[in-house]
Amino acid sequence: MERLDTFLEKIQERAKTYIGYPVATDYDYKELYPFLDYSLNNVGDPFIASNDMQAKEFEREVIEFFSELFKAPAENHWGYVTNGGSEGNLYGLYVAREIYPTGMVYYTESTHYSVQKNIHLLNMESIVIRSQPNGEMDYADFEVTLQMNRHRPVIVMANIGTTMTEAKDSVPIIRDCLKKYAIKSSYIHCDGALAGTYLALLGDDDFNFEHGADSIAISGHKFFGSPISNGVVLVKKSYKERIGRAIPYIGTLDTTIPGSRSGINSMILWYAIQKWGKDGMLQRAQNSLENAAFLRDKLNEI
C-alpha cells in the first residue's frame, strides 16, 4: 500500500538520526518472523499450561534468566513478561497493597511518572520524598517522613536508574532506615526499567533480592531492543500466591495484570538472551557506558 510505503520511508529516514530516547536499535529478529502468522497467547500464569497456542516455555526461561541475574530466592521466585516497565511497577505496587492494605507508599520526586498514576489506580496513600541533586533519594528526608508514620506499613518505590539522571536509590540504606525505626512491616519494589539489567550485569546490583528487594521490574526494549515494548516483573512466589485465583474457562490461574499476553514478546526476549549470552550482554553494557562517556566528553568540548 502506498501509505505504508510512504510511512516506512519516513521512519527509515528518522532512524538515521534518532538518539536520546532510551531504546536499543541494533537488533534483528528476522528468525521470529514466521511466528507472526500465529496468535500466540500466553494467557494467565506462565508456569501453568493454558491453551495450545502459546509460548510459555520461552517465557519461563526468560523468567529464570532474570531470576538468576537478580539473585532471587531459588525456591521462592515468580514473574511474567509484561508490556513494559510501567506494568511491572503496577504489579509490584498491587502485590504490596494486597500484603499491606494500609501501607503508605514512599517515592521520590525523580520517580517515573507512571508510578503516581499506578498509585492513583490502586487507590493507595503516598508521600513524595525529596531527591538529591543527582536524582537519588534524600535519605534524611525519608527518615523524617518515616518517623511521622511509624504506625503504618512502609511500601518503598526504589529507583534503579531515574529517567533524567540515571540515579540509583540504595536499597541497603533504605533497609537500614527501616531497621533504625523498628519498622517490621515493609515492602520494597525496585523500578529497574532503565538501568536494572545492565547494572546487574556489571555487578552494581545492591538492589537485588539478596539486598532486600521484594519485587523488581525491568524494560526489555531499552537494553535489548525490540520492535514491541516489553519487560519483566519478578516477585517472591510466596507473595504472588496471595493474589492468584483460578479461572475455569482459561484453565489457569489469574496471577497477572492483563489476561491475554503476547507470546511473541516472550520469544523476543528469549531470542535476545540466547543471541547475546551473559558475556555478550556484559560487553554490550560496557560498550554503552564507553559510548556515553565519549559523547559526554565531546559535548563538553563544544
Where do the PLM segments sit?
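N-terminal entrance/gating region of PLP-dependent enzymes' catalytic architecture
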Residues: 1-76
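Conserved aromatic-histidine-acidic binding/catalytic patches
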Residues: 50-54, 80, 84, 162, ...
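Conserved PLP-enzyme active-site core in the AAT-like
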Residues: 57, 75, 80-243, 264
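Amphipathic alpha-helical segments that form well-ordered structural scaffolds
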Residues: 61-65, 91, 118, 268, ...
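Amphipathic, well-packed alpha-helical segments that form the structural scaffold of globular domains
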Residues: 63-67, 71, 94-97, 120, ...
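Generic secondary-structure signature for well-ordered alpha-helical cores
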Residues: 67-71, 147-151, 179-183, 238, ...
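Active-site C-terminal subdomain of aminotransferase-like
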Residues: 201, 208-302
